[in-house]
A protein has these predicted regions:
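Phosphate/pyrophosphate-binding catalytic cores of soluble transferases and nucleic-acid-acting enzymes
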Residues: 1-310
């Protein structure tokens, strides 16, 4: 069986185009590890960049993108189950999988094989938390994580009160229903990190935000609202969907939306890197390569690290 290659990195680091270039070179298929790219119709705001999967005259097979409806709430448990179905199918065909994304919790959960279970809604707990601020909810979540010895629910993933309440709900359930934390098989993988210096990352984030707005991100979100998706359900997804929705429904001006969203994405990228460095402290070996190296050089470096013959 061919060992999986994992490519991780912060937003705007070019990890998807790198994964696609590598896949074209070694005849691999890509499994996405992005908590928002699972939603159909949320293309510009989540940065799917589907053109990246076109390499020359072929399209690299990709998985776990556009698999559920916007307005629904896809979760880590579902991702784990879906990942294993796809992963097992790929390796059974003798093909090498490449796991690629920036959602560190998704990546870590499948590599480590964390035991998860579907967590039911706890309406009494939700009612109790409804009036608390995001700061208060975050403090409660950190306390629960400490008591659970949990690495789940990094601040990257709880940037709205609704998401924080769901995270508290899950951690509370897990505290009351402990499980064996290794019931799923861990996945052996070579892990590649795409490192991009802070100044270049900030420049690319701002450039990409402007580009997405020019490409029609506001209209994309208007169309989702016109389809009957409640604003709070889009705000739940955070970042672009939070700030642009607030602009579309008249809560902020365009200029304020852009300013706040730009800051939020920069903060998000920083938190992603914090998560990846935390993975190293938790025992993962990540081979870092420079995002600014030429594509051919990056592909060659990965092949060398993974001991893949040219």
């Amino acid at each position: 069986m061919q060992k999986m290659i994992t490519i991780l990195g912060p937003t705007a680091s070019g990890k998807t185009s790198l994964a696609a270039a590598l896949a074209a070179r070694i005849d691999a298929e890509i499994i996405s590890a992005d908590s928002r790219q699972v939603y159909r119709g949320m293309t510009i705001g989540t940065g799917k960049d589907l053109d990246d999967y076109r390499q020359g005259d072929r399209v690299i097979p990709y998985h776990l993108i556009d698999i559920c409806e916007p307005g629904t709430k896809y979760n880590l448990f579902q991702y784990q189950q879906d990942f294993h179905l796809i992963y097992n199918n790929i390796v059974a065909r003798g093909v090498r999988p490449i796991l690629c994304g920036g959602t560190g919790l998704y990546i870590e959960s499948v590599l480590k094989g964390y035991a998860l279970s579907p967590v039911p809604q706890n309406q009494a707990l939700r009612d109790e938390l409804a009036d608390k601020s995001l700061a208060e909810l975050t403090e409660m979540l950190e306390d629960l994580k400490h008591r659970n010895h949990s690495v789940m629910h990094n601040r990257t993933d709880v940037d709205t009160a609704q998401r924080a309440i769901r995270a508290i709900e899950i951690e509370t359930y897990n505290l009351e229903h402990p499980t064996d934390n290794r019931t799923l098989p861990p996945i052996d993988s070579v892990i590649i990190g795409v490192d991009i210096n802070r100044e270049e990352r900030r420049r690319k984030i701002t450039q990409r935000l402007k580009q997405r707005l020019e490409e029609g991100m506001v209209d994309e979100i208007r169309q989702l609202l016109d389809r009957g998706i409640a604003p709070e359900n889009l705000i739940y997804y955070g970042l672009e969907y939070k700030f642009v929705t607030e602009y579309v429904i008249g809560k902020t001006s365009y200029e304020e939306m852009f300013r706040l969203l730009e800051i939020a994405i920069h903060q998000f990228a920083k938190r992603q890197m914090t998560w990846f460095r935390g993975m190293e402290r938790r025992g993962f070996t990540i081979h870092w390569i420079d995002a600014l190296d030429p594509m051919d050089s990056k592909v060659a470096q990965i092949m060398d690290i993974a001991h893949i013959q040219p």
